[in-house]
Amino acid sequence: MKVVSSLKSLKKRDKDCQIVKRRGKIFVINKKNKRFRAKQG
């Protein structure tokens, strides 16, 4: 999982990426291709 300061460019890497907020942190998840996961922080 990548840790980045801005998730906007990582959301555009794949059409199935979606942004979710869990436990106060913002994540990019992709259920079809797990290697596109990222976390902001």
From Swiss-Prot:
Protein family per UniProt: Belongs to the bacterial ribosomal protein bL36 family.
Protein name, per record: Large ribosomal subunit protein bL36
Keywords of this entry: Ribonucleoprotein, Ribosomal protein
Pfam family, one: Ribosomal_L36
GO terms under cellular component: ribonucleoprotein complex; ribosome
Example GO molecular function: structural constituent of ribosome
Coiled-coil regions, chain positions: none
Entry's transmembrane regions: none
One GO biological process term: translation
